[in-house]
């Protein structure tokens, strides 16, 4: 009974400390937003330190034209790991293809609109790897619980980012439609004015011609 009473607070202490570390690590991470002018290319770089490293890579086009871009990942040896064409968003879990610098390039080859792209680069890690020296069952249970919480938080974050990107794209579509409707209305007004003036001139010409004939 005494052992159970002592272990229970220890479990919660480990859980709280691990959760705080997880939240602190997550709060230090933030997505990067870049602007891609028409027919331009921007690249980001990331150094893999060990063979066991893995990187979560994601991007989504927030605004601009048809929201389509090209994306490719290049390994340190120069080989292309993946290449995507005309994509609006995507996610990858990149395992190490060798230690060195990885290149992530984004190209805007479709349309003439400036496109805003939000990019996420986040190193994947497990809390159990960081605490291999701790063999305590309470620590293992706490780490597993925090890992589950962290996975759920990541899912929620990705879902929210996706919904936010959809909102941005919908807003951009609405603004583009409003602009087109405005110009279409102006064009219709000009056409109506030209037709009205032409009708007046035609009627005036016909009546003027008849009066001359009668005279």
Curated annotation (Swiss-Prot):
Signal peptide positions on this chain: 1-25
GOLD domain span: 41-123
InterPro entries per the UniProt record, alphabetical: Emp24-like (IPR015720), GOLD_dom (IPR009038), GOLD_dom_sf (IPR036598)
GO cellular component: a single term: Golgi-associated vesicle
Tree of life domain: Eukaryota
Keywords for this protein: Endoplasmic reticulum, ER-Golgi transport, Membrane, Protein transport, Signal, Transmembrane, Transmembrane helix, Transport
Membrane topology (Lumenal): 26-182
Residue ranges of the TM segments: 183-203
Membrane topology reported for the UniProt record: Single-pass type I membrane protein
Localization in the cell: Endoplasmic reticulum membrane
GO terms under biological process: endoplasmic reticulum to Golgi vesicle-mediated transport; Golgi organization; intracellular protein transport; protein retention in ER lumen; vesicle budding from membrane
Cytoplasmic face residues: 204-215
SUPFAM superfamilies reported in the protein's UniProt record: Supernatant protein factor (SPF), C-terminal domain
Other notes: Present with 26300 molecules/cell in log phase SD medium.
Complexes and interactors: Associates with EMP24, ERV25 and ERP1.
Family, per entry: Belongs to the EMP24/GP25L family.
Annotated function: Involved in vesicular protein trafficking.
Name of the protein this chain belongs to: Protein ERP2
Lineage: Eukaryota, Fungi, Dikarya, Ascomycota, Saccharomycotina
Name of encoding gene: ERP2
């Amino acid at each position: 009974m005494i052992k159970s009473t002592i272990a229970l607070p220890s479990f919660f202490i480990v859980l709280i400390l691990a959760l705080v570390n997880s939240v602190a690590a997550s709060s230090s991470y933030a997505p990067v937003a870049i602007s891609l002018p028409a027919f331009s290319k921007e690249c980001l770089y990331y150094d893999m330190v060990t063979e066991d490293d893995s990187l979560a890579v994601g991007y989504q086009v927030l605004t601009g034209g048809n929201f389509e871009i090209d994306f490719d990942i290049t390994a340190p040896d120069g080989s292309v790991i993946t290449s995507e064409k005309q994509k609006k968003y995507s996610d990858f879990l990149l395992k190490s293809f060798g230690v060195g610098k990885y290149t992530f390039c984004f190209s805007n080859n479709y349309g003439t609109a400036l496109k805003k792209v939000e990019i996420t680069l986040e190193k994947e890690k497990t809390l159990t790897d960081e605490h291999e020296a701790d063999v305590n069952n309470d620590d293992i249970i706490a780490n597993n619980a925090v890992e589950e919480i962290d996975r759920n938080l990541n899912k929620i974050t990705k879902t929210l980012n996706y919904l936010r990107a959809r909102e941005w794209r919908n807003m951009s579509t609405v603004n583009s439609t409003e602009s087109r409707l405005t110009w279409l209305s102006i064009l219709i007004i000009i056409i109506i004015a030209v037709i009205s003036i032409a009708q007046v001139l035609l009627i005036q010409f016909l009546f003027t011609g008849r009066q001359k004939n009668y005279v």
